[in-house]
């Protein structure tokens, strides 16, 4: 009798334990499934973000290439001395864009090249692609290796400043074909920067040059008009502090 009683109690204890272990196994399985679902969803989200970024970068590259190639074609038709490099996004002027030794202004041919290229750059900036990606034009003046670093730095700054002055100074011959609206756009788009003798060419003559470097917005950059500098309209005639050869 006692043996049967103990046997019943033992079976009841076993029967009470079985559902507990089954529920624990089910819980672990459910947690594993949940973990896999979360992991798959996370990987899918990351993959989609990468694909969107790659597609955005591809679209950006295509837009910039289309803009630059169109600018290159127009420049070639207007003035053969204007060289548009769509690989480095640079505009140079060959021998017309070279400075004499220790001088910071271009000759008549170089001024003519500037006069021809500026409307083309402004047109590119106002294009559909330009409105999305065109950030600014950096005017870079280069020197040869003669003289000290600081001397050449000052000279390169003068050269890039002179190019900017030739676009905005009221005494410059280039002013004849630049409207007040274009002047305002030049002030927003163009930036003068000195480079000294970095990126020297094969000869000293070729090193003494000016180039225009096109910069474009990246995917993460936001072209917010609220952040743009609001330049006042030109009331008085702009006068450069450098000597402007007439």
From Swiss-Prot:
The record's PROSITE patterns line, in alphabetical order, gives: OMPA_2
* Phenotype of null mutants: When this gene is missing the Zorya system does not confer resistance to SECphi27 in E.coli.
Annotated OmpA-like domain ranges read 86-218
Where is the protein localized? Cell inner membrane
Question: Which residues are listed as membrane-spanning?
Answer: 20-40
Q: How does it sit in the membrane?
A: Single-pass membrane protein
Which Gene Ontology cellular component terms are annotated?
A: plasma membrane
Extract one GO BP annotation from the record.
Answer: defense response to virus
Its biological purpose: Component of antiviral defense system Zorya type I, composed of ZorA, ZorB, ZorC and ZorD. Expression of Zorya type I in E.coli (strain MG1655) confers 10,000-fold resistance to phage SECphi27, 100-fold resistance to lambda, and 10-fold resistance to T7. While most T7 infected Zorya-containing cells undergo abortive infection, a minority produce viable phage progeny. These eventually accumulate to a high multiplicity of infection, leading to culture collapse by 2 hours after initial infection. ZorA and ZorB probably assemble in the cell inner membrane and exert their effect there.
Instruction: Return the protein name.
Output: Zorya protein ZorB
């Amino acid at each position: 009798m006692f043996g049967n009683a103990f046997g019943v109690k033992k079976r009841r204890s076993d029967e009470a334990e079985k559902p507990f272990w089954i529920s624990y196994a089910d819980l672990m399985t459910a947690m594993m499934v949940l973990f896999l679902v979360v992991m798959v969803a996370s990987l899918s989200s990351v993959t989609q973000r990468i694909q969107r970024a790659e597609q955005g970068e591809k679209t950006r590259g295509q837009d910039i290439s289309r803009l630059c190639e169109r600018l290159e074609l127009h420049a070639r038709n207007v003035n053969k001395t204007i060289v548009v490099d769509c690989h480095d996004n640079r505009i140079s002027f060959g021998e017309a864009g070279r400075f004499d030794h220790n001088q910071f202004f271009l000759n008549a041919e170089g001024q003519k090249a500037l006069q021809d290229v500026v409307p083309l750059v402004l047109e590119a900036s106002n294009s559909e692609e330009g409105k999305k990606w065109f950030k600014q034009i950096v005017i870079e003046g280069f020197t040869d290796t003669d003289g000290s670093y600081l001397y050449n730095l000052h000279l390169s700054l003068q050269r890039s400043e002179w190019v900017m002055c030739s676009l905005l100074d009221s005494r410059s011959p280039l002013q004849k074909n630049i409207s007040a609206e274009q002047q305002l756009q030049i002030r927003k788009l163009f930036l003068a920067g000195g480079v000294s003798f970095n990126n020297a060419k094969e000869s000293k003559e070729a090193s003494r040059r000016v180039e225009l470097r096109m910069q474009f917005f990246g995917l993460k950059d936001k072209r917010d008009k609220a952040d743009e500098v609001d330049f006042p309209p030109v009331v008085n005639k702009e006068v450069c502090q450098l000597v402007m050869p007439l």
